[in-house]
Amino acid sequence: MNVLIPSQLRDYTGGRAHVEARGGTLAELLADLERRHPGIRFRMIDEQDAIRRHIKIFVNQQPTRDLGTALAANDEVVIVGALSGG
């Protein structure tokens, strides 16, 4: 399925905004992203296996924080990272 990667994580994807990944759940998709792009998962998931507070994930335009969210092959996943500034 198509995954949109936020600009602050594109160093892990060779600069690509759109990447392919597979998984029956959001957790499996993130594990596949990690396999394809080592180091990216830790930037999104904390030590307690929860989505980091500054990361938002949308599946077919619906926000989710549940790693058990079921996915289908034609779903679109958008990962958004909050930007900070001062």
Which residues does each predicted region cover?
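Ubiquitin-like/PB1-type beta-grasp interaction modules and other compact soluble beta-rich domains
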Residues: 1-85
